[in-house]
Structures are given as C-alpha cells and as structure tokens.
Amino acid sequence: MFWLALAAMAAISPLQYGYAALLAKEAASLTLLAVWIACQAAGALPALHLVRRGRLGVRACLAAGAALSGLGLAAAAFPAGWPITLIGYALLGGLGAGLVYGACAEVVAAWYPERPAGRVGLITGAFGYGAAPLLLWAGIDPSATSAAFLVAAVLAAGVIGIAARHLRLPPALWWPGDVDPRSHALDAARLRTTPEPARQFRLAQALRTRTLPALALILTCAGAVSVFDVIVVAGTGSWSAVAVLVALNGAGRSVAMRCSEVFGRRHVLAAVLTALAAGQLLLATAVTAATGAGVLLWAGVVFAGLGGGAFYPLIASLVRELFGAERAGEIHAVVYSAKALAGAGAVALALLALSAPASALLAAAALAALPALATPRLRIPGLPATIPL
C-alpha cells in the first residue's frame, strides 16, 4: 500500500515542480501555474471527504486522477493555445493531482494509525522529489522538454492506474497487529513531544478557533515561498541546482518528521521556516554578488530546499495534534486548501522577480520569517490560557 501511494505521488510531481521550473517564465504561464495550484489544493478537499465517508471509492478516485493527471501533463507537453492549456493543464490536471493527493494521503493515514503523520510525510515527500529526473532531462536538453512531459504523462497514467487497481482502505477501526495499542497510548516519550488534544474537534468547531486560521496562514506564506524558489532558481540556468532543490524539498519532509518526534512539531516547524527564510537571504545575496555567487546559490538552495517542503507534513501532524485524530483529515484538507492562495502569492513574487529579483527574494524572506516567529505561539485550542501548551 505504502509504496504504491508513494509512486502515485511521485507521478504527479512534474505537474507542479516540472511546470514551475521549465515552463513558468512569463505572466501567462505563471497564471496557469497559479490556477493549477488552486485546483490541486481545492480538489484534495472533496476527494478526501468523499473517500473517508465511503461515497467515492479509492479505485474510482485514483482512476479519475490518473486520467486527468496524464491529460494535464500532455497539455503541458503540447501547448495548443492559452485557453486549451488552461482547461487541460490548469483545471483538469490540477483537479486530477488533487484527487491523487487526497486519496493517497487518506489511504496511508488509515493503514498506519500509529504513525499517520510520519507515513504521510514520506509519501508527500515523493510529490517533491518526483520531478527531479524530468528537470535534469529537460534542463540539460531544452529541446526535449515536450518529450519529457509526454513521457511523464504516460508514466503518470500508468503508475496511478496501477495504484488505483490495488490501493484500498483498511477495515473499520484497523490497528496493526505488531503494535500494542496500550503501550502506544501510554508511551511517555511520545506524549512529551506530541501531547494529546483537549478534545476531538469537529470541523465547525475547529473553524471557530484561532489556531486553524493561523495554520492556514503559515501554509499560505511558506507555500508561496516554496513554489517561488523553484521558479527563481530555474531562472539562474543551473539545472543541477533546481534538481537538488526539489529533491531536498521532498527529502526534507521525512527528515523533519523524524526530528519532530524528538523535539516536538512546533519547534521543528519554526526551525524549518527559519531555514526557508535563510535560504531566501542567501539566494538574494547570490543574485547580487559580484564574486562567490555560485557558493551562495548552492547554500541558498540547500536551506530553501530543506525548508521548502517540510512544513506540509508538519502542519498536517499539528492538525492531528491540536484538533484530534477523528476529523483530522477533514480539518487538514481545509488548511491545505489555503495552498490556493499560496499559488497566487508565488506568482506575485515571480512577477516581481522578472524586474527586481533581489527585492522579490527579500520579500520572500520576510514572508517566511513572519510565520517562523509566530509558530512557537501556537496553542492547543480548548485549554485555559494559563496552561503553557
């Protein structure tokens, strides 16, 4: 189950990161990217909701995702005018990626109830680094861009189609046989770093707290900077740096989740956002430096890559930690839908970078630094203010 979901996530990665690096170079294509991100973020919410309630089977959801994702990549491979690309890539491709993302996350979280956030973090990492081979191929040989996207379309349709055939939800109240539920529930080390919520929140209750909008704002700011980094690093022409950036974007997610189990979600999220902000400052220095620009570029890529994707699974795990596990999927889907605003923010930064790249990177640094400062102040909703959690 896990490896099929991971492969499906990797297959949709070129739709976001491949397009952002290779094709988002002017206002029209940047607008298409923003629409795609909005559709992908919005598509994940109903997909997860319908799959969780049994109104849409995992097979049907992923089969539709396979067809639409393949269509979106094919539309990117052979652009036939802005309106057609808008429908094929941005609208249908974005919806297809959202279906795959939502279904795979729900299936993996259900099969691994003892460590749902860590496992989901691993498969969302594939959504980051899955585009690295395409970026290297098309980056080294720009004339092969259409062929690379066409191959990605065929692979996406095939891989997600196979996942649709085999992925399924576990039985109700599933728990793995090799994990003692009592020992897991009373694990002092786990409770110290991931405290239990005050109660199990329903979606309507979570929407009335201050914590949920704060998480959505953090995701919006960090998500905008993450996508913007792919665009701005691709503009340097260093395709090895772009590939490393997206690879670290994915790998950093699993590393951050491991660290969060030791140091706590909020502390690691603050560190991740700080690294993302530091990456922007290094990249801004690189684009203005007369000497040493290469070293600064690579340092910026490392920091921006490690911070540019890790916040996604950390926010997902914080939703579970703060609001409870019963409706965590629905609540996180609402938070994740804020990625639609992140896409618009990324495009705004990219448009600014066309004329003033250093200023755009400094603005991105501020956009990442503000939530980094606010993250340690996140509190468990429902507890009295005198309790320091």
What is each stretch, according to the model?
Residues 13, 67-80, 275-291:
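C-terminal ends and interior cores of transmembrane alpha-helices
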Residues 219, 243-318:
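C-terminal transmembrane helical hairpin of 12-TM major facilitator-type secondary transporters
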Residues 322-355:
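A late C-terminal transmembrane helix in Major Facilitator Superfamily
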